A protein has these predicted regions:
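A short alpha-helical cap/connector motif
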Residues: 1-205
Length: 205
């Protein structure tokens, strides 16, 4: 059984990613906070929805730390307009989906990949009456995209479930913060903010 992150050595954590290939690491600095939040769910059959999976770094954290979880990963694997100005990211795009597939291959029985724009996937999941205990939102950073992801995923969240909004305090733009603040205001009677920092985490009441 996987131990809570606080009890894991750096070697064990590194072992989770042995043989994987990543062009970027935008997530690992958030793992201690996520582990603290998820500790009560550690052995439960949690259903997770991830919006924006890139190469699978954060998905692998959830799959390793929550050994009974199932995760649905939504991504176009084509990048977005915000990546146009970064030559390193542009260079990584052609092999993005192949790296995701290779990195997550050993978890095929616990992972569902949906290759689509997030709003399309979220509407389809809603029509299928899918529900999730945890939603991790790391999709588009424009206000419209981030707000749409928040609202559409909220309807898929179980009562007392969590939403983790990544990049809330991103220093390259305020779109996520504006969108998430608007979401929290509009859904003020339905959610409780449990953490506010680089990520903002809310729980459904």
């Amino acid at each position: 059984m996987t131990k809570p992150l606080a009890q894991l050595s750096s070697d064990v954590i590194a072992g989770w990613y042995e043989g994987c290939a990543f062009s970027e690491d935008w997530s690992s600095h958030n793992f201690p906070l996520c582990a603290q939040l998820l500790r009560p769910l550690h052995t439960m059959p949690v259903k997770i929805l991830e919006i924006g999976s890139w190469e699978g770094l954060s998905a692998l954290f959830f799959l390793n730390y929550l050994p009974s979880c199932q995760i649905t990963c939504v991504d176009t694997f084509a990048g977005s307009g915000e990546h146009v100005s970064d030559p390193d990211i542009l260079a990584a795009l052609p092999g993005l989906e192949k790296r995701f597939d290779a990195n997550t291959k050993r978890f095929q029985s616990r992972i569902e990949k949906i290759k689509a724009r997030s709003h399309v996937a979220l509407i389809d999941l809603g029509l299928a009456r899918r529900r999730f205990d945890l939603v991790y939102v790391d999709g588009g950073h424009e206000v419209r995209d981030a707000y749409g992801d928040a609202v559409l995923s909220w309807s898929l969240l179980t009562r007392k479930g969590f939403v983790i909004f990544d990049d809330y305090e991103w220093d390259k733009g305020t779109g996520v913060k504006v969108a998430v603040d608007a979401f929290c205001w509009n859904f003020i009677n339905e959610c409780i903010v449990v953490h506010r920092g680089y990520q903002l985490i809310v729980r459904k009441v």
